[in-house]
Amino acid sequence: MERILQNFSDYLMHVRRLSDHTVVAYVGDVKQFLCFLIENDIELKDVSRLHIEEYIKKLSKQKTKLNSTSLARKISSLRSFFNYLQLTSIKDENPVEGIRNPKIRRRIPDFLLPSEIQKLLEFSMKNQRDYLMLSLLYFCGLRVSELCNLRVEDLSFSPAFVKITMGKGKKDRIVPLTSKLAEKLENYITSCGKSPEDYLFGSQIKIHPSTVFRIVRKYTMMCGIKKRIHPHTLRHTFATHLLQKGVNIRVVQDLLGHSNLSTTSVYLHVVDQEKFDAINKLLQEG
């Protein structure tokens, strides 16, 4: 069974080209399901749709109740696992086919106001590294993992852009840099004496995501922002501000590296909400 799990992990990483985080989550979900099979004396080859439904019921009834998003991911993990077993002729059919994921209520992402972003960057300017990290998260809409994986060779200054090669789904993308940010990055690289193969933040060892979280938290507290802010909030803010300024949603999709437009569309709700708020203000004033 360990060999099957390892091969499944390799399949997700090298064939499906999923992110490391997603692979770990999927394999963990499958391990949990395999424990259920052992507890109930069920052979993997004998798993039917009925067993899958029983397992989902068990997950739904456990003390620490799963939210719809977590349950949907666990079902997706099993669907991928049995697809893999079909591909490798270990199982003839996929018992998860036809089982619907629970409906997920899309939560409108939190974002910062332009004045809050300005404060955040102003407070971090005394620390060159921190300022550049926050600037890349906001002006380029990077994920934390993408920021941590950036190497000097991923940056171009003529023309000015950053190449993201380790994004979710392993899809390369190009994100332009503002002239001001490009200049500051070039000065930072020169002053630190970095080589092309060095990590931008770090050298031989990349910076840890937890460090990025601490830096974001530090400056939000310093400038008195009361919202619960994390690095991904800056990515949400990047997308929201672009849409508010009338940028085409397809362009925003490409900049974010989303494979599906529906993922980007969630930010439209933020813009729509602003319209409703504006009308409500008129009603209140009237």
From Swiss-Prot:
The active site is at 143, 168, 232, 235, 258, 267 (o-(3'-phospho-dna)-tyrosine intermediate). One of its GO terms (molecular function) is DNA binding. Keywords: Cell cycle, Cell division, Chromosome partition, Cytoplasm, DNA integration, DNA recombination, DNA-binding. It is found in: Cytoplasm. Residues 1-86 form the Core-binding (CB) domain. One of its GO terms (cellular component) is cytoplasm. GO terms for biological process: cell division; chromosome segregation; DNA integration; DNA recombination. InterPro entries: CB, DNA_brk_join_enz, Integrase-like_cat_sf, Integrase_catalytic, Integrase_recombinase_N, Integrase_SAM-like_N, Tyrosine_recombinase_XerCD. Residues 107-280 form the Tyr recombinase domain. The keyword Oxidoreductase does not apply. The keyword Nucleotide-binding does not apply. Site-specific tyrosine recombinase, which acts by catalyzing the cutting and rejoining of the recombining DNA molecules. NCBIfam families: recomb_XerA_Arch. Belongs to the 'phage' integrase family. PANTHER family: INTEGRASE_RECOMBINASE PROTEIN MJ0367-RELATED (PTHR30349:SF41), PHAGE INTEGRASE-RELATED (PTHR30349). This is Tyrosine recombinase Tlet_1492. It comes from Pseudothermotoga lettingae (strain ATCC BAA-301 / DSM 14385 / NBRC 107922 / TMO).
